[in-house]
Each structure stands twice: as C-alpha cells, then as structure tokens.
C-alpha cells in the first residue's frame, strides 16, 4: 500500500506509513517495490515504526481502550491487528505535533474488520463493536 501511494504521488506529497509489523526491513521492501514499479525512487515518505505494539497480532489494553474510545467518538470501526494500530499512531503523532498545522491528513483504512468478531470471541468481547453492529 505504501509503495503504491508513494509511486502514485510521484514525490508530490508526504506519505507516512504505519506498519503493523515489527522491524525496519520494510524500508528496503518499499523502496524495492517503488523502484520496480516506477523505475525511480522517491524520498517523500516515512516509515513510522513506533506503533506495532510488539508486532503482527500483538496488542495491549492501551490499544483496546483507544479502539473503543475511537469508536465511541467517531463511530468508525477499527481492529486491533491493522487499522487500530494505524489510527493510534496517527492520533499520537498529531498529539505530539508531528504534522504541520492545518495539514490535510488522509488515512487509508486498509481492512481487517473481519477479525473483530473472531477477536471478541477469542478474548471475551474486549472491543465494544462487532462487524455487524
């Protein structure tokens, strides 16, 4: 997703990617995808690796609390594997002042909602919303 956005923007806007995976190996992979698809490289992107919560499928109560509060406030369903980490990261980066004032921020919800029901079944309805609600 990040490589496609960076290549599609062709250096015109900044892309901040928030991976659910742990590790900086994605930097090389994204650069490789951009080069293979566009035939050039761009430096208009950043990989923000502080919000993986331990890696793929990892989570903690802080993330669950954020997801539930986010849903209560905005009525937007996010999951604890992918999009919850993304929105937590964006929200925290805004609070830390890491976006310029009056910036237009576009967050792409890349899916993962199908996991909410299974997550709640496995861990006891920690999320206050399901896919069908």
Where would I find each of the regions flagged by the language model?
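Active-site-adjacent helical/loop segments in soluble small-molecule enzymes
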Residues: 48-102
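Conserved beta-strand elements of the Class I
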Residues: 104-106
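Glycine-rich phosphate/pyrophosphate-binding loop at beta-loop-alpha junctions
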Residues: 1-53, 108-133
């Amino acid at each position: 997703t990040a490589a496609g956005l960076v290549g599609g923007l062709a250096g015109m806007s900044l892309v901040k990617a928030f991976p659910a995976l742990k590790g900086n190996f994605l930097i090389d992979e994204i650069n490789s995808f951009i080069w293979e698809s566009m035939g050039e490289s761009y430096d208009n992107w950043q990989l923000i690796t502080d919000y993986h919560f331990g890696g793929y499928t990892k989570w903690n109560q802080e993330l669950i609390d954020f997801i539930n509060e986010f849903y209560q406030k905005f009525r937007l369903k996010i999951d604890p594997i992918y999009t919850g980490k993304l929105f937590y990261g964006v929200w925290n980066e805004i609070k830390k002042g890491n976006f310029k004032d009056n910036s237009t921020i576009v967050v792409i919800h890349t899916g993962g909602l199908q996991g909410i029901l299974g997550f709640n079944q496995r861990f006891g309805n920690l999320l206050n919303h399901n896919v069908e609600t």
